[in-house]
């Protein structure tokens, strides 16, 4: 497996008095600003999650380096009596509003306990910012208005984690990828299925999309295709030994049956991965206008050796490339962002990922040409 050279690599969150998990990254292109979020935990376990932290990075397009500011706690992203988990940033380019979605889980009640008892103590929340994350609104609990009575049909649920999506349609629709463990008849355990929360009015109201087939958990979405052929692509964690993908022809409301993506391997219990769409940088006559990039551990036995994969035909699950290695050792969750053109003229990406056995969360920056030089050499 080839190793990818990088433009920059820097540890942003380091375990000490606190642990850090679940990275989320968003790039605000006009401001040339990166916002890196993570859960700050009392220990590494889910039950000891507490609040979110944020580091703000200023990207210098001349030096191709990011200067990071000190860590700050996002105190507004907190629902009393609950712990904040799964940060999901979303930027509405039309209203210039930054959303931070997350789940709030009561006390120290674990996901396992909710699955065993069928008692859902998880809430859907968000905060917003109109100054690119410098100040934030008070928290809003969207559970009753968005999920309603369906909440009691789920043993628990989650969002993302990681970046969300604004569609290129007229409404500028907003999508928050999510998953829920739906309760089954008494002899069956709750089963996970992915879906999206949708807004067609810039976040004033939200609705539930319909579920993808079972065996789909933590997920991310991207928009691929052109014109009337645009579809929402969903890539999800599974326990099937490989990722699953599904596509929606109607802005994330309905998804066709999922497909197993055998080239994107999963460890036995699965792991979160990140997917992002970006404009096709080549001039090939038969090239589609959007490609996909994906990051995830490359080992089918355990969470180790973070790789990046490329798909030049996004809807075909058989056309994913072999991975290029981004980081060695125990690596887990990651989040990708497209940062425009890099110094070599090819698309540039930022990646925030868990490293060193969950001891640190690292930011690295690389170009498509660094990761997949053969793509450009073949032109």
Curated annotation (Swiss-Prot):
EC identifiers of the protein: 3.2.1.18
GO terms for MF: exo-alpha-sialidase activity
Keywords: Carbohydrate metabolism, Cytoplasm, Glycosidase, Hydrolase, Lipid degradation, Lipid metabolism, Repeat
Residue ranges annotated as motif FRIP motif: 20-23
Gene: NEU2
Coarse class of the protein's main subcellular location: cytoplasm
Annotated catalysed reactions: Hydrolysis of alpha-(2->3)-, alpha-(2->6)-, alpha-(2->8)- glycosidic linkages of terminal sialic acid residues in oligosaccharides, glycoproteins, glycolipids, colominic acid and synthetic substrates
Family as reported in the entry's similarity comment: Belongs to the glycosyl hydrolase 33 family.
Coiled coil: none
Name this polypeptide is given: Sialidase-2
Annotated localization: Cytoplasm
Alphabetized InterPro entries for the sequence: Sialidase, Sialidase_fam, Sialidase_sf
CC annotations in GO: cytoplasm; intracellular membrane-bounded organelle; membrane
Biological processes annotated in GO: ganglioside catabolic process; oligosaccharide catabolic process
């Amino acid at each position: 497996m080839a190793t990818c050279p990088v433009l920059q690599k820097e540890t942003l969150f380091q375990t000490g008095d606190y642990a850090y998990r679940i990275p989320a990254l968003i790039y605000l292109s006009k401001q040339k600003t990166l916002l890196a979020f993570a859960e700050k935990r009392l220990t590494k376990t889910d039950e000891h999650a507490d609040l979110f932290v944020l580091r703000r990075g200023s990207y210098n397009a001349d030096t191709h380096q990011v200067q990071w500011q000190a860590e700050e706690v996002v105190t507004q992203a907190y629902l009393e009596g609950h712990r904040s988990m799964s940060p999901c940033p979303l930027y509405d380019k039309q209203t210039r509003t930054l959303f931070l979605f997350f789940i709030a889980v009561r006390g120290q009640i674990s996901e396992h306990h909710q699955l065993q008892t069928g008692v859902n103590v998880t809430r859907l929340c968000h905060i917003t910012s109109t100054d690119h994350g410098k100040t934030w609104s008070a928290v809003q609990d969207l559970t009753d208005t968005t999920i309603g009575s369906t909440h009691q049909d789920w043993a628990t649920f989650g969002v993302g984690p990681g970046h969300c999506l604004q569609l290129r349609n007229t409404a500028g629709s907003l999508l928050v990828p999510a998953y829920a463990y739906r309760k089954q008849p008494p002899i069956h355990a709750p089963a996970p299925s992915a879906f999206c929360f949708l807004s067609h009015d810039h976040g004033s109201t939200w609705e539930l999309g319909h579920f993808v087939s079972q065996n789909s958990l933590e997920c991310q979405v991207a928009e691929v295709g052109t014109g009337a052929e645009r579809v929402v692509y969903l890539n999800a964690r599974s326990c099937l030994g490989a990722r699953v993908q599904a596509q929606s022809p109607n802005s994330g409301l309905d998804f066709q049956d999922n497909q197993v993506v055998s080239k994107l391997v999963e460890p036995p219990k699965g792991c979160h991965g990140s997917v992002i769409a970006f404009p096709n940088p080549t001039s090939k006559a038969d090239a589609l206008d959007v490609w996909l990039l994906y990051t995830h551990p490359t080992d089918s036995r355990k969470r180790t050796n973070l790789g990046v994969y490329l798909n030049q035909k996004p809807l075909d699950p058989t056309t994913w490339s072999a991975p290029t290695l981004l980081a060695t050792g125990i690596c887990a969750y990651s989040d990708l962002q497209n940062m425009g053109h890099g110094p070599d003229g090819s698309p540039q990406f930022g990646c925030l990922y868990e490293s060193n056995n969950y001891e640190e969360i690292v930011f690295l920056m690389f170009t498509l040409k660094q990761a997949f030089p053969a793509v450009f050499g073949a032109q």
